[in-house]
Amino acid sequence: MDKLKISANGPLNGEITVSGAKNAALPLMCAGLLTSGTLRLKNVPMLADVKTTQKLLQGMGARVLTDNISEFEINGGTVNNTCAPYELVRTMRASILVLGPTLARFGEAQVSLPGGCAIGSRPVDQHLKGLEAMGAEIVIEHGYVKAKGKLKGTRVAMDVVTVGGTENLLMAATLAEGTTVLENCAIEPEVVDLAECLVKMGAKISGIGTSTMVVEGAGELHGCEHSVVPDRIEAGTFLCAVAITGGRVVLRNAAPKTMEVVLDKLVEAGAVIEAGDDWIAIDMRQRPKAVDIRTVVHPGFPTDMQAQFMALNAVAEGSCRVVETIFENRFMHVPELNRMGANITTEGNTAFVQGVEQLSGAVVKATDLRASASLVIAGLAARGETVVEQIYHLDRGYENIEKKLGSVGAKIERVSG
């Protein structure tokens, strides 16, 4: 099993190109099931979850071609199987996103209940409740969601803000008969990206980027070409890496308007940030200052950046609180950071961080995707060698992270065994 060996190597300097967002690419790929035409996606990150989604769509009969760099062609005209099996779905929660489009287009779908990151309960009840409101008959048998029926437009008020639920119901509504009003929608950039692609495919959607979207059902959708929005979490991870080591790095193919609260927190920590339409520059010349974090739904501070800022705060000047309001059980990186010399205590959904001057390298285990990133960041500033094990989590969300960090001066290598 691969692992990363990391040693501090001074400030980082240079340029990094940000990949497309995995959390946008996966629902966009599933949207290919809505049409018999060809959906051409650009700026797709070549990640494990993307490859799993490719296999899932191909298993359903879709024709999926890729240049294995950043482009995909998905043709749903050959779909001949409406079942998404456990073997593929078990590794990735986003697999549930085939449910809405498959049911809407074919009148039936069978999808195994998903797996994915071990960071607490992330139920799909809002997905199912919304589809039932639109006329679907749904039962859960032997670990599978079995749905059938012709979908009709209606008002769906989600009980909680859910990104995946919003995406699933939005895709389903594009082919439902009549008008669907989706209330309490997630407004993350990845949801907006999906909606904008669906409009290119012929969907009629108003209220994009707001908590209420109105969808006029279309008889059918067609193919289109779409570029995946840049990954704001990958960008934020690299910015935290520079903030902890010092240096100056420019991120290309970035989307600063999608991550303003993260940039504000970096400035609060002592970084100098500049940004244009598609680039971000960070200049860090001092020990970071501790910053309080409270995760909330977009446009607030993203839960997917909490662990990275925990690593930054671990060596910051002063003390702070980190409050996690989105997921329970998302402090699994704390014991590993403490093994490296951090001074972090937790109480419920709050972590109390007292910054230390330096961390010490250690053998640490990644427990989920963003926890992995926090350990990499910590290793870049620790005295001695850090070995991050179980990095298959990291590969689910970061494309060539060791090569990208290495290109700006980090001492980091992937080793097998």
From Swiss-Prot:
Residue list for modification 2-(S-cysteinyl)pyruvic acid O-phosphothioketal: C117
Subcellular location: Cytoplasm
Superkingdom per UniProt: Bacteria
Biological process annotations from GO: cell division; cell wall organization; peptidoglycan biosynthetic process; regulation of cell shape; UDP-N-acetylgalactosamine biosynthetic process
Pathway note: Cell wall biogenesis; peptidoglycan biosynthesis
GO molecular function, one term: UDP-N-acetylglucosamine 1-carboxyvinyltransferase activity
Catalysed conversion reaction: phosphoenolpyruvate + UDP-N-acetyl-alpha-D-glucosamine = UDP-N-acetyl-3-O-(1-carboxyvinyl)-alpha-D-glucosamine + phosphate
Pfam families in UniProt: EPSP_synthase (PF00275)
Binding site for UDP-N-acetyl-alpha-D-glucosamine: R93, R122, P123, V124, D125, Q126, D304, I326
UniProt keyword Cell division present: yes
EC supergroup of this enzyme: transferase
Entry-linked CDD domains: UdpNAET (cd01555)
Entry keyword set: Cell cycle, Cell division, Cell shape, Cell wall biogenesis/degradation, Cytoplasm, Peptidoglycan synthesis, Pyruvate, Transferase
First-listed, main subcellular location of the protein, grouped into a coarse class: cytoplasm
Record: residues binding phosphoenolpyruvate: K22, N23
Function: Cell wall formation. Adds enolpyruvyl to UDP-N-acetylglucosamine.
NCBIfam families hit by this protein: murA, PRK09369.1
Protein name, UniProt field: UDP-N-acetylglucosamine 1-carboxyvinyltransferase
Gene behind the chain: murA
